[in-house]
C-alpha cells in the first residue's frame, strides 16, 4: 500500500489490513504484515481459513438472493476484494459498513459509480447510532439480511450480543442473519495469538459453539445449521479439504 491517509497510523497493525494480507491482497502496511506473519506462525492455516470465509460469503449471499432478499447490510465489510457482496447480488440494495477510515476511503472509491450500493462509516459497538444511519439507506419495513463475517470475534460480549439483539428487533420477520465466527482451535497457543491482536486495532474474542449459537436466538437456522465454513452448502465441484475447523458459520431467518 502507498502512503497512509491522514489520521491513519501505519505503525499500528490493523485487523482489516491483516485480513487483506491473509487473502494475498496489497492493501496493507509493514506493521500489518509483521503481525499477520506472527499469527501465521501460531496458526499456519489462517490464510486457508480466510479463503474459506470468502467462499462461504459467496455461497451465503447466493442463498439470500434465492430466498428473495433484496436488501443486504454487510457489517465489518473490510477492504474491497474480489467477490464482494454487491457483485454476487447485483440486483440487491447493498450497504457496506466499517469503522475504519482507510477501509471506507477505498470502499467509496471502488463503488463511486455503482448504483444501489453505499459504504457507511460507523462503529457497530454503537448499534443505535448505526441504525439511525441505516434508516436513510435501508427500508426496515421489508426483510433485510445482516452479514457479520469475521466480525463478532473482534467485539466484546457486552457489545456483540447487544448489537445482534438490536438489529434483530429493528428488522421484520423474514429477515436474515449471517455469521462466521472464529473458535479456539489450539488452546495451548491461543494466548499468544491474543497478545498479537492486543497490539492491533481490535482484540480477539474467541467463543465456544454454544456462545455462537446464542447470537441466533429468535432466528431459525437454515440447513445444515451451525457448522464449519467448508461444510455449509459446499459447491459440488469443490472438495471439502482437510482443514475445515477454523470456526463456525450459520445463516438464519428471523421468525
Predicted regions and their residues:
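Rossmann-like AdoMet
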Residues: 1-122, 126-140, 168
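Conserved S-adenosyl-L-methionine
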Residues: 19, 220-233
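A short SAM/SAH-binding and catalytic strip from SAM-dependent methyltransferases
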Residues: 124-125, 134-161, 167
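Conserved beta-strand signature within the Rossmann-like core of class I S-adenosyl-L-methionine
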Residues: 145-147, 164, 170-182
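Short "lid" loop at the C-terminus of a central beta-strand within the Rossmann-like core
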Residues: 151-154, 182-186
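Short, glycine-/aromatic-enriched active-site segment of Class I SAM-dependent methyltransferases
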Residues: 187-202
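Short alpha-helix
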Residues: 203-226
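Core SAM-dependent methyltransferase catalytic element
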Residues: 231-255
Amino acid at each position: 500500500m502507498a502512503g497512509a491517509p491522514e489520521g491513519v497510523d501505519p505503525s499500528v497493525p490493523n485487523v482489516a489490513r491483516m485480513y487483506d494480507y491473509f487473502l494475498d491482497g496489497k492493501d496493507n502496511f509493514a506493521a500489518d504484515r509483521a503481525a499477520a506473519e506472527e499469527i501465521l506462525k501460531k496458526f499456519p492455516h489462517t490464510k486457508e481459513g480466510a479463503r474459506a470465509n470468502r467462499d462461504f460469503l459467496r455461497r451465503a449471499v447466493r442463498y439470500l438472493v434465492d430466498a428473495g432478499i433484496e436488501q443486504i447490510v454487510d457489517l465489518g465489510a473490510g477492504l474491497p476484494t474480489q467477490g464482494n457482496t454487491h457483485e454476487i447480488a447485483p440486483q440487491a440494495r447493498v450497504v457496506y459498513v466499517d469503522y475504519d477510515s482507510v477501509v471506507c476511503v477505498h470502499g467509496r472509491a471502488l463503488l463511486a459509480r455503482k448504483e444501489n450500493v453505499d459504504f457507511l462509516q460507523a462503529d457497530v459497538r454503537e448499534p443505535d447510532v448505526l441504525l439511525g444511519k441505516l434508516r436513510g439507506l435501508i427500508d426496515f419495513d421489508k426483510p433485510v439480511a445482516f452479514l457479520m463475517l469475521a466480525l463478532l470475534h473482534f467485539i466484546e460480549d457486552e457489545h456483540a450480543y447487544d448489537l445482534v439483539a438490536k438489529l434483530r428487533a429493528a428488522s421484520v420477520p423474514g429477515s436474515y442473519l449471517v455469521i462466521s465466527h472464529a473458535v479456539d482451535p489450539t488452546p495451548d497457543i491461543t494466548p499468544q495469538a491474543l497478545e498479537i491482536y492486543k497490539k492491533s486495532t481490535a482484540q480477539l474474542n474467541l467463543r465456544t459453539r454454544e456462545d455462537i449459537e446464542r447470537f441466533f436466538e429468535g432466528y431459525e437456522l437454515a440447513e445444515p445449521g451451525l457448522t464449519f465454513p467448508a461444510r455449509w452448502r459446499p459447491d459440488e465441484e469443490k472438495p471439502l479439504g482437510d482443514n475445515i475447523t477454523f470456526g463456525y458459520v450459520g445463516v438464519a431467518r428471523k421468525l
